[in-house]
């Protein structure tokens, strides 16, 4: 046919062709969240919210069976050990590459110190306040350390959300610090706040060390080492510092199992998020743990939630909204395949 000959398919030079327009794209193709936004959402939904259950469940296990904090650390670490099977199946070394093995073990040690301080603090301090102090210190330390060590700056909106979250935490924990009782009870409560602060410091250092590790199986290796280091340090300490106690009822066993699963999920999500977004922003989004802990403190533990706690939780949620909205930047797919 004549119409199929290449000669007849040439464009007509006397009539200029209309300007080419890119084909219409679906909404999910035109606008997609950035990596930082994905990381923050993972930290919010998979890191902060599950972690909010850990404090109340730990307190319930302690109240039901007088389960010491070291046993909770041991039970949590046991959930990390099966990750060794995944590393073996992939053919990866259990302790990480030899050249950065020391840094990997140090990161695992910081994670163990973080969870140990957290579990010890919630036994003498209200769960919401303990989570508040820990997240407060982790956010401030992450912002300072990242700025000094990595020279990674934050935008004005990020600083606004960061400072707002810190303000909310001060509103929550401030009245409790001014009303510490004198005597032994006040000393134990003060030590609980100190442990919560040290736990946040260990968390921020652990996140920075984790960001410096670059090998394919980084996350499962650090998770396994956290369990291994935790067991090596907690099992001897349990027999020296405390008397081993077995959970006495089904409620205690359920709380221990839930703590192990939820903390492993939170650990994995935070490890992913910190490779995508600024550590200080990840810690700020993790303040959702505080809000969840306050809710569970009232409904599960039947502990009083002061008006300042509610006000501070509202400020924290508003700050998280600012940070998340700032990072919800739509990336247009400007390239059209020809």
Swiss-Prot record:
One Pfam family named in its UniProt record: EamA
Signal sequence region: none
Keyword Ion transport annotated: no
Residue span, EamA domain: 49-174, 272-325
Entry membrane topology: Multi-pass membrane protein
UniProt keyword annotations, A-Z: Membrane, Repeat, Transmembrane, Transmembrane helix
Transmembrane domains' residue ranges: 37-57, 160-180, 190-210, 221-241, 250-270, 281-301, 305-325
Places the protein is found: Membrane
Region (Disordered): 1-29
GO cellular component: membrane
Main location: membrane
InterPro entries: EamA_dom (IPR000620)
Family named by the database record: Belongs to the SLC35G solute transporter family.
Protein name, as recorded: Solute carrier family 35 member G4
């Amino acid at each position: 046919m004549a119409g199929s000959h290449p000669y007849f398919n040439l464009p007509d030079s006397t009539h200029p062709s209309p300007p080419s327009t890119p084909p219409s794209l679906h909404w999910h193709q035109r606008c997609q969240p950035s990596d930082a936004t994905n990381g923050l959402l993972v930290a919010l939904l998979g890191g902060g919210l599950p972690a909010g259950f850990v404090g109340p469940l730990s307190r319930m296990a302690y109240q039901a069976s007088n389960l010491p904090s070291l046993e909770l650390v041991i039970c949590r670490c046991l959930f990390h050990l099966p990750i060794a099977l995944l590393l073996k199946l992939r053919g990866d070394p259990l302790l990480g590459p030899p050249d950065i093995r020391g840094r990997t073990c140090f990161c695992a040690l910081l994670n163990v110190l973080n969870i140990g301080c957290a579990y010890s603090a919630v036994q003498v301090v209200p769960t919401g306040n303990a989570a508040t102090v820990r997240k407060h210190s982790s956010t401030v330390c992450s912002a300072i350390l990242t700025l000094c060590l990595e020279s990674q700056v934050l935008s004005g909106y990020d600083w606004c959300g960061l400072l707002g979250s810190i303000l909310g935490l001060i509103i929550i924990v401030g009245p409790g610090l001014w009303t510490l009782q004198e005597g032994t009870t006040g000393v134990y409560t003060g030590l609980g706040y100190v442990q919560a602060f040290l736990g946040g410091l260990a968390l921020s250092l652990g996140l920075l060390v984790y960001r410096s590790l670059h090998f394919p199986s980084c996350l499962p290796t650090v998770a396994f080492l956290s369990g291994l280091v935790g067991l090596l340090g907690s099992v001897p300490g349990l027999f020296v510092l405390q008397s081993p106690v077995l959970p006495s009822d089904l409620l205690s066993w359920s709380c221990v199992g839930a703590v192990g699963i939820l903390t492993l999920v939170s650990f994995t999500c935070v490890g992913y998020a910190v490779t995508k977004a600024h550590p200080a922003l990840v810690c700020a989004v993790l303040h959702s743990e505080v809000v969840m802990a306050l809710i569970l403190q009232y409904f599960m533990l039947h502990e009083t939630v002061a008006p300042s706690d509610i006000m501070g939780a509202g400020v924290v949620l508003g700050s998280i909204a600012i940070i998340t909205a700032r990072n919800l930047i739509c990336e247009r797919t400007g390239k059209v395949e020809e």
